[in-house]
Each structure stands twice: as structure tokens, then as C-alpha cells.
Amino acid sequence: MVAEMPWLWLRPASQALGPLVQWQGGSLISTALDQGRGLVLLTPHLGCFEVCAQAIAERFGQRTRLTAMYRPARQAWLRQLEESARARPGLATAPAALAGVRQMMRALRRGEAVGLLPDQVPPQGMGVWAPFFGQPAYTMTLATRLVQQTGAALLLIWAQRLPGGQGFVLRVSPPSQPLPSAAADDAALQQACASALNQEMALLIRQAPSQYLWGYHRYKQPRRVHAVTGDEAAP
């Protein structure tokens, strides 16, 4: 990943990924976009997750803009680098904050696509504890709330690295099971959805466990910030 990042971030926008990317299941994205109800794309910290957004923007940028959520760096210089590096045709970025959540909601209601990493640990109050590989992990509720509140389609995607620097395979798939849609109350529903989401991420990771970013502190305690509620996120 260290070797990939400079090339992905610093190459000219005119230099396409081209033959470095193979697609499996790309037609699922086309079908979802045809429905016109918005599309939520989820990828864990698996493979070259940075290439997913760029590849989607290159292939589908004429049809939709992809808004990808990211956590801004604390250092100003790095934050500026991230923003400039990710500013590419067909691709917008949304900070992991209230403004970014609203930005993604608006994009979905326009029928556009959004992307985020659902195994990223959210701030306290924006997730629930749910099993992940048999251990409790604080899991975001935003990903499934976006689907629930907008009626958007949901797909999973990850970029598998090929050996010898041959490129990547973008693997797109639907969830193995529909998300839970009924429960005793909203808290129970979000708990069930978080558990289902973690199961989906685990299924992807088992396809190539050596390519998962195990060094990411998935089981850490959430940081304390103001929690975003569903009412606040509504534009």
C-alpha cells in the first residue's frame, strides 16, 4: 500500500488506470444506477481500497458522480494533499462529519453513488457494538442508515491486488443477504444491521485475508465527539 499511494495520488488526472484494472461484476453498478434511486458502495480496508473510487469514477463518471467519505488528516499539509489528490473527474469527497453526511444524503437523493469504508471505527454515539470475527467491534450505523433513509441500492466492492504489480481486480457483489428491515425498535434494528454488515465484510475479507489491513485498530474504543443523529443528517 505504501508503494501504491504516491502513484495513485500524484499521477495526473489525465493518466487513466486503464489496463491495470479488471472488473468482475461491474454490470451490477450499471444496473443499480439505472434504477435511479442512488447507490451505496461499501468496501472494507481490503486490497487497494484507494483504487476503488478512482476506478469507479473513470468507468461510470459520465453517468454519475461518486462521493467518497474520508476522515481528514489532522495535519493541515496532509489534509491539503489528500483533498487535491482525490479531486478527480467524476469524484467528490465528503469529510467524516455532519457536513459530509448531509453531502452524501443529497447525492443519494439525486440518484448518485456514494462510497465509504464501513469497518472504520466511528465516533462515540455513531455506532453500536457488534461481532466482527467473533470479537465485539464498535461498528458504524451510517452505512446502513444511508440505505434506510434514502432507499438506495447497496453493493459491496473491493480491489484485489494481483501479484507482480500486474494491477487490480475490482470485485463487485451484492450482499449475501438483504439487510434486516424490521425489529422491535430502531436500536434493535441498527444492532441487527451492524451485525449483518460485519458478516458481509468478513465474507469479503475471507476471500483474501492476507490483503486485509489487520494493522487498522478495528477493535479500539470510539473517540468522543458530537454524535450525528438521523434528524441532524437530513438536509
What are these regions (language model features)?
Residues 1-43, 48, 80-83, 88-90:
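Membrane-anchoring hydrophobic helices of lipid-metabolizing enzymes
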Residues 19-22, 75, 94-98, 136-137, ...:
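A conditional alpha-helix N-cap/helix-loop micro-motif detector
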Residues 33, 58, 98-235:
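Non-catalytic C-terminal accessory region of glycerolipid acyltransferases
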Residues 36-38, 63-65, 111:
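A general structural motif
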Residues 40-44, 56, 67-73, 140:
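Short beta-strand->loop
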Residues 44-48, 72-74, 160-165:
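Short glycine-enriched loops at secondary-structure junctions
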Residues 48-61:
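Histidine-anchored nucleotide/phosphate-binding helix
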Residues 64, 68-103, 114:
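Short, conserved active-site entrance elements at the starts or edges of catalytic domains
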